[in-house]
Structure formats: C-alpha cells, structure tokens
C-alpha cells in the first residue's frame, strides 16, 4: 500500500514513518521536489524497483482525498510544490513608503496588477506570486489601462482605486451565435422581436401584463398563483379540477344539476325560490330561522326538545292526552319546563288536558306539575282511535283517560335506565329563600347566587331525576268539577310581567331587573325577591351622591372617603356637635386625613383642629373671618399678627413704648427681647417651644447611649427642674369623679367639661391635671410659676422656655460658684448634687462656666415663706423623672 504520509508515492518532508506492508523493512528514496506530481498510472521508482502507479490510492492534487491529506483549500498553491520567495529589506522599505503615500501597495512583479490595502497581504502574495506565468487566465482587462485580472472582483477593486472619476464605457451589442445561459433576471427596456420560438426551461417572472394577440397553445398545465381577472367567458370543454375553494362573488346561472359529493359550507343565507327535494336526512347543527310558515305534509319525529317562543296555532283538534313519565334522557328541556309552568301554557292546554281550577300550590308560590300544560317540546303519545273534539265540547273520555293514566300504570321504561337510576343524584328542591337584610346588610349572598345562576345556565338542559318525576304524579285520580274552568288572568300585553313570564317560558328563569344578578323560576318568586331587593338597594345607596354599593362596608368606606364632612340624615338628626366631633375623629382615624367638603377646595388635614379651623374660614371673605387684631399704641394701626405689630413698633417707633396696662397677661414678654430668625423676622413662640422640646429629646437620646447615666446630669441637672412650680389640682366633687370614672369604663375616654374645649383623656387623672391649667372654664386656672422671677405661665412648656431664655445661667451650676445657702435651695438640691460640690467641682464633658461678680442679687430665688400656700409642697417635692406632663399627675 501507499504510505499515507506521502503524495503520489513521494515522502513528505518531516515524516519518518514507513508505510505498512508485507515487508516492514522496506526502504524508501526521497525524490526531489517536482512541480508536477506523477500522473495516474505512471510507474514510480521506489527502492531501485519500478512500482506501477496506484491509481485508486494515489492522491492526485485536486481530489478530495488530496485536500483532506494536505489540509489545503482548492485554488491555492501547495507549500510542498513551491518555494517561498525571500523579500529584501529595501523592497520592504519601498512598500512602506508607498503605503504611507497611497494607503495601498502594488505587487512589483511584472504582469501582476494586484493591489493590497496592507503590507501583510502583499507580503503573503509576493512570496507566492507567479507574475506573467498566469497571463492566459487574465480574462478581465481594464478599459482604461493595460492592467488585466483573473476575476471581476479584482477588476472592480482596481477601477475603484485608480479610475473612480472615469465613467464606464457603454457596452456594444454584438451578434450572439451561441445560446446564452441567463442565470439572473435581465431588465429589458425595449421590446425584443423574437422570430423563432424560444424554449423557456424555468419560469419567467412577468411584472407587467403581456398583450397576446394570438392564441397560445399550452402543452403543460400552468400553475396560477395570483388571481387573473377574466373579462370574457372562457369555454371549458373538459372538467376542471378545483383543489381550493373558489370564492363566488356574483350569481352564476346553473342550467344543469350539479352533483355535490362533499359538504359545502354556507356562510351567508342562500335565498331559495323553488322547493328543494330532499331525499336524504339533513343534519342541522345551528338553528334555522323560519320567517314564513312551512307546510309540513308528514309528521316530523322530534328526538330533542324544541324551544317554542311564540304560541303555535293548532288547526286540528288534538285527542285527549295521556300522562307521560319522562325519564332523564327524555327530559332535556330547561328545568322550568319540567317542574314549573306559567299561567299561559296552562290556559293553552285547557281544552286538551282538562284540569281542576283549584289546586294546592307549593310553599314558594310555584305551580305544581299537575297544573302544567303539556309543552310542544315533548312528543306525547295520543290515542288515534278517539275522534276529533270541538273546542267548546268537554271530552267525555277525559276522566277515564286520566284515571287510566294514574300511578298504578306507569309507562314502560328502558330497562337500562332503570338499572342505573340509583346512581343519579336528585337535584335539590328550590325553596325560594331570599337574601337576609340582617348582619352586614350587604349583597354578599349575591355572589353565590350569581355563581349558582352560571351553573344553572350550563346545566339547564338537564331536568329533574326520575324520582322527582315519579313524585309529581298525582297520587289520587283527579276529579273534574262540572263548573267551567275559571279564566286565567293574563297580564297586560307588553308589560313587564308578560316579559318576565315569556323569559320564564323561553329560558326557564327570569332575572331580577333591580340587581340583574338573582334569577327566579316563577313569577311569584321573582316578585317576592324584588320586594326585598328594592329595600336592599335603597339601604346600600349613598345618600349624598346616590351611588349604589354591594355591601355596607363599601358604603361606609365611600362615605368616609368622599363625604367625611357630610353626615347622613339619620346621623345629623340624632346627634349634635359632640357626635359630629366623634364621627370626624373616627373618619380621621380610619382615613388618615380629613378633606374639605367645599367645592373647588381640595384641602386635606391630618388633625381635627386644623380641619375645624379651616372649616370656619373656608369660603368666607376676609372681612367675615374673626381674626385677632393687634393695635399699635403709638399710631393706632392694627395688625393681624403679633409679629407684624412688633416689627412695626421696632421700625417706626424707636422710642420706648408707653407702660403696658395692668390687665395685660403676665406671660406676655417684651417684644424687643424676642428671638429672631437669620432673615430678621421674629421667631414664633410655638416654634421656639418646639425647638426646646426637641433639644430635650436629643439630650435624652444622647444620655441613653452612654453606659453610665451621669452624662445626663452634666447636660441637664436636676436643679433645673425645680426652678418652677406646678399649679395645684382643683378640688372636685366626689360624685363628679365617680361619673367620670364610669364614663371612662363605658366609652374608654372622657371629655373636658368646659365649653369650647375639645380635650379628651383616657383617664380621670389626666383630666384632673388638664383642668388645673384649662383656661376655658369658669374657674381661675392655676399657673406655672417661675421661682427665679415673679412671672407666671399657663403651660409647663412656657415656663421651661422662659427659664431657658432668661435664666440660662441657672441651668448649669459648678463648685466654683456654689448656690446660695438658702433653706429652700438646701431642701431642693438633692444629695447627689451636694456630693459633687464637695468633691472639688470636677465635671466631665463640659468646661465650667464662670459667672461674673457683677451678677445682680435680684436673681436669687424668693424665700419659701413668700411662696403661695398651694405651691410650698410642690416646690419641696423633687422630681426624679425627665419630664412629668400634665396627664401624668397622680390622682387624689
């Protein structure tokens, strides 16, 4: 065998393996490199012996086996057959200069006109370029120069790089002596005269219509992919096979009968002017509307129930009917047809099936099956031997027929149905229960009723089981009274009752027009439900905007969200201002904010006080709003705010103001000593008090982080809390206290008894502490008294803020400046503070503040003997907590 590592019997360079064979020690001779490998069948000299060329296993260059072995692609020179050309350094430098000048490099070999956009591409090409050796393959010459190329792509690159500004010369048409194969579509701008027939092997795309003046004979079937308009009738001599449905837009006259072997779908109504003879059964899957009376010459067997929406006039007299027991498979009509019946069908069947006028009805107002007229949906067996009866005559054999059809002789049934009868479930009897109005007073039951209605509509083709049908057969024979049957009262034509009755006849149930959810199977049951439903709808309707809701919870939420300031008529009539406040408080708790009810005002408030303040001013002109006024004592001008008044006094009247009247409140301070904002405006007192409280909270949070609580003593010592006294609690009637305690037990809260005070507390002790400082009552409220000066305040925050601003140096005391030895101060200073003073006055955290010796002596606190009697015990009592609010006072 030939060595797989050699080509054409030659040893490849770099291979040292010997080929397999019978003689494993065979030697091989390396041949010189030849440009042309040995041809197939040529003898090869190997090892001094002439070996015939092996055609099947000799890898000829160009064959697939040779390509796989060498790993080279077609069209490239083989590395084994060609030595790579060396490139001198000077030539490389020339290429670099040329590339810098023109951005491309041209092959320097004569006869080669290729250009490359990179030096690496030219280097690879130059090592393998054969120059003019391939001149016989240069079939694409350049029309502007002497260059020639082997492919059209190379010619296009050359033209774009060198002759871009010169237009292409027009090609001259030459005579075609041989057939030309056209592989791509050719655009033809002028008509081409064809003298001989042209054979077309492939389909030719025609974009414009071609006028044909002579008939064209077609030897093969021509597939038509697009619709071709036909203006003249095309005579068809042979049958044409139609594989796809052909839409017919115009009427086509048919002179001969057309045999239809397959079903033809009819999507539009087809007018039939002549009678069509039907020899086979036609299955009708959809209901066919019949607008004209159809004459039926033969009886039509109906296997399924037929819904009849209008009364059918019967021209012939029907013989007396018999009682028929309906099995489950036969009773496919709606349930109302099998169990209930209206008055209209009972009246229609009076002359055919005589029934007594007075019969007992079920509890829910439904008519029993004995009063039911036989519907045309069932095929009843009739006695053919009985003669026809006139409408006015009473059938003589009616009683005997009814007696014969009693429960003693039931009709024959299918034994297979009787075998499986016990497996069927008996449907529950309709009780006619109405939804209750108690509880949440909502329509929550309507959801279940709606689900039941959906299930009933899907199962309304199923009737009651055979047990129900057996129960509804009268146990005793019916006796027909001799009196004429009482005429049935029909509702007025076109009235709602007639529509409901018609709906019961057609669908087996009628929908309540009030709620459009609940359905009833009898007119009496529907009326009974409508009475309750109307009350339910009225109770669940918003009294302000008349919107309807399904539950009481939804109505309450809507009222709170949209009409929070508008109480309902019932609530407005029952309660007064207190009830209205409670209602608004509940709305605020549930909704989070209160909206202004005025039209065009979208203000919302998160507090009851802000809402009531806005209500007193919303929609009123400024003159009607009773705002406070601050008159100037110098010029008489009035201002709406104290800040505006103070600014006017400081800017216009620099002289000191006259003495203030004696009746001025003691808590009012000098306007010149108030704090200002960085912009120069007077800072509001409420804002200053709020900042003070925030500082206290921050100090507490800072002290809570330390492992030892001593830092809090350094920040705010206990002596600072004893520089003012709280007012004493008022003496109250024990009976009044007991009444308040009972009110807290019942309601959970108690209101302030003073007029125009809206304070509310959850404990009697909190209310008592509030009454000590409430200024809206008839009694004189107690004051918070500063122990460092004779000023009094109505709130604890006011006296704290006063001490912070006026007596700031008294908040921090050091051993360098011990407090005066006063009996009141000795009793007020705790033991802990005394130990600190004796220890040498070392304090952690803050540098002691030195007091000037010029401090006035008037800053000393007054003697305990000068305090009011009610404040002695208060001042002597030390406060250990951070802050004791008014609601935390102990109850006496």
From Swiss-Prot:
<feature type="zinc finger region" description="C2H2-type 1; atypical">
    <location>
        <begin position="105"/>
        <end position="129"/>
    </location>
</feature>
<feature type="modified residue" description="Phosphoserine">
    <location>
        <position position="409"/>
    </location>
</feature>
<feature type="compositionally biased region" description="Basic and acidic residues">
    <location>
        <begin position="819"/>
        <end position="831"/>
    </location>
</feature>
<keyword id="KW-0238">DNA-binding</keyword>
<dbReference type="InterPro" id="IPR052274">
    <property type="entry name" value="Krueppel_C2H2_Zn-finger"/>
</dbReference>
<feature type="zinc finger region" description="C2H2-type 2">
    <location>
        <begin position="140"/>
        <end position="163"/>
    </location>
</feature>
<dbReference type="GO" id="GO:0008270">
    <property type="term" value="F:zinc ion binding"/>
</dbReference>
<dbReference type="GO" id="GO:0005654">
    <property type="term" value="C:nucleoplasm"/>
</dbReference>
<feature type="modified residue" description="Phosphoserine">
    <location>
        <position position="686"/>
    </location>
</feature>
<dbReference type="GO" id="GO:0001227">
    <property type="term" value="F:DNA-binding transcription repressor activity, RNA polymerase II-specific"/>
</dbReference>
<dbReference type="GO" id="GO:1902894">
    <property type="term" value="P:negative regulation of miRNA transcription"/>
</dbReference>
<feature type="zinc finger region" description="C2H2-type 4; atypical">
    <location>
        <begin position="594"/>
        <end position="618"/>
    </location>
</feature>
<feature type="short sequence motif" description="NuRD interaction motif">
    <location>
        <begin position="421"/>
        <end position="427"/>
    </location>
</feature>
<dbReference type="InterPro" id="IPR036236">
    <property type="entry name" value="Znf_C2H2_sf"/>
</dbReference>
<keyword id="KW-0677">Repeat</keyword>
<protein>
    <recommendedName>
        <fullName>Zinc finger protein 512B</fullName>
    </recommendedName>
</protein>
<comment type="subunit">
    <text>Interacts (via its NuRD interaction motif) with RBBP4 of the nucleosome remodeling and deacetylase (NuRD) complex; the interaction is direct and may play a role in repressing gene expression.</text>
</comment>
<comment type="similarity">
    <text>Belongs to the krueppel C2H2-type zinc-finger protein family.</text>
</comment>
<feature type="compositionally biased region" description="Basic and acidic residues">
    <location>
        <begin position="850"/>
        <end position="876"/>
    </location>
</feature>
<feature type="zinc finger region" description="C2H2-type 6; atypical">
    <location>
        <begin position="750"/>
        <end position="774"/>
    </location>
</feature>
<feature type="region of interest" description="Disordered">
    <location>
        <begin position="812"/>
        <end position="892"/>
    </location>
</feature>
<keyword id="KW-0597">Phosphoprotein</keyword>
<dbReference type="InterPro" id="IPR013087">
    <property type="entry name" value="Znf_C2H2_type"/>
</dbReference>
<keyword id="KW-0479">Metal-binding</keyword>
<feature type="compositionally biased region" description="Basic residues">
    <location>
        <begin position="418"/>
        <end position="428"/>
    </location>
</feature>
<dbReference type="InterPro" id="IPR048408">
    <property type="entry name" value="ZNF512_C2HC"/>
</dbReference>
<keyword id="KW-0805">Transcription regulation</keyword>
<keyword id="KW-0804">Transcription</keyword>
<feature type="region of interest" description="Disordered">
    <location>
        <begin position="323"/>
        <end position="473"/>
    </location>
</feature>
<feature type="region of interest" description="Disordered">
    <location>
        <begin position="649"/>
        <end position="682"/>
    </location>
</feature>
<keyword id="KW-0539">Nucleus</keyword>
<dbReference type="Pfam" id="PF21276">
    <property type="entry name" value="ZNF512_C2HC"/>
</dbReference>
<feature type="compositionally biased region" description="Polar residues">
    <location>
        <begin position="371"/>
        <end position="384"/>
    </location>
</feature>
<feature type="region of interest" description="Disordered">
    <location>
        <begin position="562"/>
        <end position="582"/>
    </location>
</feature>
<keyword id="KW-0862">Zinc</keyword>
<feature type="zinc finger region" description="C2H2-type 5">
    <location>
        <begin position="630"/>
        <end position="653"/>
    </location>
</feature>
<comment type="function">
    <text>Involved in transcriptional regulation by repressing gene expression. Associates with the nucleosome remodeling and histone deacetylase (NuRD) complex, which promotes transcriptional repression by histone deacetylation and nucleosome remodeling.</text>
</comment>
<feature type="zinc finger region" description="C2H2-type 3">
    <location>
        <begin position="540"/>
        <end position="563"/>
    </location>
</feature>
<dbReference type="Pfam" id="PF00096">
    <property type="entry name" value="zf-C2H2"/>
</dbReference>
<feature type="zinc finger region" description="C2H2-type 7">
    <location>
        <begin position="784"/>
        <end position="807"/>
    </location>
</feature>
<feature type="compositionally biased region" description="Basic residues">
    <location>
        <begin position="832"/>
        <end position="849"/>
    </location>
</feature>
<feature type="compositionally biased region" description="Low complexity">
    <location>
        <begin position="385"/>
        <end position="398"/>
    </location>
</feature>
């Amino acid at each position: 065998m030939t060595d797989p590592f050699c080509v054409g019997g030659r040893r490849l360079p770099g291979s040292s393996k010997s080929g397999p064979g019978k003689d494993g020690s065979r030697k091989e001779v390396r041949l010189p490199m030849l440009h042309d490998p040995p041809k197939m069948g040529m003898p090869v000299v190997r090892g001094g012996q002439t070996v015939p060329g092996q055609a099947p296993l000799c890898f000829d260059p160009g064959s697939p086996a040779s390509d796989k072995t060498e790993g080279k692609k077609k069209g490239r020179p083989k590395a084994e057959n060609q030595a790579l050309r060396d490139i001198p350094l000077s030539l490389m430098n020339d290429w670099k200069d040329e590339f810098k000048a023109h951005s491309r490099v041209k092959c320097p070999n004569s006869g080669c006109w290729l250009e490359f956009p990179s030096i690496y591409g030219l280097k690879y090409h130059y090592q393998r370029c054969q120059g003019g050796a391939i001149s016989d393959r240069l079939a694409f010459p350049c029309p502007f120069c002497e260059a020639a190329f082997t492919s059209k792509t190379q010619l296009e690159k050359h033209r774009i790089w060198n002759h871009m500004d010169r237009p292409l010369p027009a090609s001259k048409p030459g005579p075609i002596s041989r057939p030309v194969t056209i592989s791509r579509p050719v655009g033809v701008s002028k008509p081409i005269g064809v003298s001989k027939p042209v054979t077309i092997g492939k389909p030719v795309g025609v974009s414009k219509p071609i006028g044909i003046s002579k008939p064209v004979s077609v030897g093969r079937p021509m597939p038509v992919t697009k619709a071709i308009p036909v203006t003249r009738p095309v005579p068809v001599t042979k049958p044409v096979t139609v594989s796809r449905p052909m839409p017919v837009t115009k009427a086509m006259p048919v002179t001969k009968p057309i045999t239809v072997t397959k079903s033809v779908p009819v999507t539009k109504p087809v007018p039939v002017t002549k009678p069509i003879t039907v020899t086979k059964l036609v299955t009708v899957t959809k209901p066919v509307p019949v607008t004209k009376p159809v004459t039926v010459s033969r009886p039509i067997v109906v296997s399924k129930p037929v819904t009849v929406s209008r009364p059918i006039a019967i021209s012939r007299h029907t013989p007396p009917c018999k009682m028929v027991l309906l099995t489950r498979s036969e009773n496919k009509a709606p349930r109302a047809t099998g169990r209930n019946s209206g008055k209209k069908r009972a009246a229609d069947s009076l002359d055919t099936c005589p029934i007594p006028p007075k019969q007992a009805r079920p509890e829910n107002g439904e008519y029993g099956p004995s009063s039911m007229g036989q519907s045309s949906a069932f095929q009843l067996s009739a006695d053919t031997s009985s003669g026809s009866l006139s409408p006015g005559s009473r059938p003589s054999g009616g009683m005997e027929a009814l007696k014969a059809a009693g429960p003693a002789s039931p009709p024959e049934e299918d034994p297979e149905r009787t075998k499986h009868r016990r497996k069927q479930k008996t449907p529950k009897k309709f009780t006619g229960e109405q939804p209750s109005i108690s509880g949440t007073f909502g329509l929550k039951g309507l959801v279940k009723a709606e689900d039941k209605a959906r299930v009933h509509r899907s199962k309304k083709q199923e009737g009651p089981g055979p047990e129900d049908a057996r129960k509804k057969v009268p146990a005793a024979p019916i006796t027909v009274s001799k009196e004429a049957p009482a005429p049935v009262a029909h509702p007025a034509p076109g009235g709602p009752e007639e529509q409901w009755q018609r709906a019961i006849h057609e669908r087996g149930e009628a929908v309540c027009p009030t709620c459009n959810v609940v359905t009833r199977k009898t007119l009496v049951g529907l009326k009974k439900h409508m009475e309750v439903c109307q009350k339910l709808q009225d109770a669940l309707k918003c009294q302000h905007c008349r919107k309807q809701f399904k539950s009481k919870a939804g109505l309450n939420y809507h009222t709170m969200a949209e009409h929070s300031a508008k109480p309902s008529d019932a609530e407005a009539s029952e309660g007064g201002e207190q009830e209205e406040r409670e209602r608004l408080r509940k709305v605020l708790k549930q909704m989070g904010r209160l909206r202004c009810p005025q039209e065009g005002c979208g203000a919302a408030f998160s507090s009851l006080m802000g809402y009531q303040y806005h209500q007193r001013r919303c929609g009123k002109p400024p003159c009607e709003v009773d705002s406070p006024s601050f008159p100037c004592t110098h010029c008489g001008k009035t201002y709406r705010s104290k800040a505006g008044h103070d600014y006017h006094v400081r800017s216009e009247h620099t002289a000191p103001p006259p003495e203030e009247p004696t009746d001025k409140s003691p808590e009012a301070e000098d306007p010149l000593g108030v704090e200002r904002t960085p912009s120069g405006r007077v800072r509001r007192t409420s804002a200053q008090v709020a900042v003070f409280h925030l500082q206290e909270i921050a100090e507490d949070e800072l002290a809570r982080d330390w492992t030892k609580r001593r830092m809090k003593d350094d920040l705010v010592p206990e002596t600072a809390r004893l520089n003012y006294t709280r007012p004493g609690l008022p003496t109250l009637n024990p009976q009044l206290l007991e009444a308040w305690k009972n009110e807290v037990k019942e309601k959970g809260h108690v209101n302030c008894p003073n007029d125009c005070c809206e304070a509310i507390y959850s404990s009697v002790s909190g209310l008592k502490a509030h009454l000590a400082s409430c200024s809206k009552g008839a009694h004189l409220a107690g004051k918070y008294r500063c122990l460092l000066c004779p000023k009094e305040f109505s709130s604890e925050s006011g006296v704290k803020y006063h001490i912070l601003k006026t007596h700031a140096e008294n908040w921090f005391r050091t051993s360098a400046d011990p407090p005066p030895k006063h009996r009141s101060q000795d009793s007020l200073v705790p033991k802990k503070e005394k130990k600190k003073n004796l220890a040498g006055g070392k304090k952690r955290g803050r540098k002691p503040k030195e007091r000037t010796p010029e401090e006035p002596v008037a800053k000393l606190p007054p003697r305990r003997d000068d305090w009011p009697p009610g404040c002695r015990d208060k001042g002597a009592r030390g406060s250990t907590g951070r802050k004791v609010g008014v609601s935390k006072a102990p109850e006496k």
